Amino acid sequence: MKNIFLHSLSLENYRNFKNLELKTDNTPIILIGENGSGKTNILEAISLFYPGRGLRSAKLANVCKTSEDHCLVKALLQSKLGLAEFTTQFKRSSNRRITEYNESKIANNELSKFTSMVWLTPHMEGIFTSGSNDRRKFLDRIVYNFDPKHAELVSKYEYYMHERNKILVEDIRDDNWLKIIEEKMADISNHIANNRLKTLEFMQQAIDDLENEFPKADLSIDGIVEQKILNGKENIVSFITAELYQTRSKDKLLGRTSFGVHKSDFLVKHQKKNILAKFCSTGEQKAILIAIILAEMNYAIKLTKIAPILLLDEVFVHLDDKRRQYLIEFLTGLNMQLWVTTTNLEGIENFATKAQLIKL
């Protein structure tokens, strides 16, 4: 099994840090400090070495230290392809982000070729009651760990969708180019939808197989394209192309694409109660979310033989003793690099003896 883990992390002008240097190894790491000390900022910096905008989905301008024009995050990381140096830097003046792998520029969506990562934050605990966009992105991040090419597909789809919207809204009369774009969107949509469905099948099996202290969930996806595939419809690409063609006039008025895999919703049910997670208590929602993360970690390791980095922000807060102890035993048993934030060690004293403590 390959372990993805950080050997070192360096921050320059990042959030509240002027300069920070951390040396780590493939063990659990506990970041301990008062609220506002920068614990979550460190997790966010690590999460930037995975496709997307990090665990906060922050705008570039917000990650640079106040009054500074640039910031830099550097990591020496044991990746899928071996030991490598990764950097990502931002310039407030140009609003650009540049990511490099061993001093060669790479696209953000290429990061899943090198790294594997899972995170759980307090913000995510509201994912079941927030908009479908957050749940869909959560599902797609899960897919990245099973299929690294999925990130590139999602990025390409969003690019072509933006181009289509621009042509329609600006009334650019180029039917041939529009047709080509819609055909590309349709082909990519087919791959995205199939990847999601395959991953959901893996995940459901993982949830059903894993006996633990957290509630089991039933996972599904509510999307026209995914449903057509499940129903056995043939010529999916042609179907999507036709739908995009038929909605041109409507989308021109709306200024956006009203049909496609970007409208799908990731649905989660409490298995025992047979109700959607959004109708469960906040405590149950957190427990269900943890159960999904555990299943993802467990099955990703079994299926891909790769142990991802796990980032847990204040995850032990409000967990009862039984669930907290189970979670600690489960995670330490996976033999992976685990980053945990906390304001104190109450309830996790034994876990702390096996971890690297970093006080902020």
Curated annotation (Swiss-Prot):
Q: GO cellular component terms?
A: cytoplasm
Organism whose genome encodes this protein: Rickettsia peacockii (strain Rustic)
User: What main location does UniProt list?
Assistant: cytoplasm
Compartment(s) of residence:
Cytoplasm
What residue stretch is flagged as signal peptide?
none
* SUPFAM superfamilies assigned: P-loop containing nucleoside triphosphate hydrolases
Is this entry keyworded Nucleus? Answer: no
Q: Which residues cross the membrane?
A: none
Positions with a binding annotation for ATP: G33, E34, N35, G36, S37, G38, K39, T40
Q: Which Gene3D superfamilies match?
A: P-loop containing nucleotide triphosphate hydrolases, RecF/RecN/SMC, N-terminal domain
- PROSITE patterns annotated for this entry? RECF_1 (PS00617), RECF_2 (PS00618)
In the record, the note on similarity to other proteins reads: Belongs to the RecF family.
Q: Does the keyword DNA repair apply?
A: yes
Q: What is this protein called?
A: DNA replication and repair protein RecF
Q: Which domain of life is it from?
A: Bacteria
Q: Name one Pfam family in it.
A: SMC_N
Q: What does this protein do?
A: The RecF protein is involved in DNA metabolism; it is required for DNA replication and normal SOS inducibility. RecF binds preferentially to single-stranded, linear DNA. It also seems to bind ATP.
The entry's keywords: ATP-binding, Cytoplasm, DNA damage, DNA repair, DNA replication, DNA-binding, Nucleotide-binding, SOS response
An example GO BP is:
DNA synthesis involved in DNA repair
Q: What Gene Ontology molecular-function terms does this entry list?
A: ATP binding; single-stranded DNA binding
